[in-house]
Amino acid sequence: MPKMKTHRGAAKRFRKTGTGKLKRGKAFRSHILTKKSSKTKRHLRKAGYVSDSQLKVMKKLLPYL
């Protein structure tokens, strides 16, 4: 059986934490920021985590992460 391939786009966007969760950056942070409040932009700086329902799909995309 051939080696499993890592999805390179996903590998650039996710990092594994010590407990096995997947950490991700948040969207809506690159441009058109003038209409967003300071509070919204501050919350977008914080890391997000992949939900438990999506974790199984992500493990297939990132078998060696």
Swiss-Prot record:
GO terms for molecular function: structural constituent of ribosome. One of its GO terms (biological process) is translation. Residues 1-26 are annotated as: Disordered. Signal peptide: none annotated. The keyword Coiled coil does not apply. GO terms for cellular component: cytosolic large ribosomal subunit. InterPro entries: Ribosomal_bL35, Ribosomal_bL35-like, Ribosomal_bL35_CS, Ribosomal_bL35_sf. It comes from the Bacteria. Keywords: Ribonucleoprotein, Ribosomal protein. The keyword Chaperone does not apply. Belongs to the bacterial ribosomal protein bL35 family. This is Large ribosomal subunit protein bL35. It comes from Clostridium beijerinckii (strain ATCC 51743 / NCIMB 8052) (Clostridium acetobutylicum). The gene is rpmI.
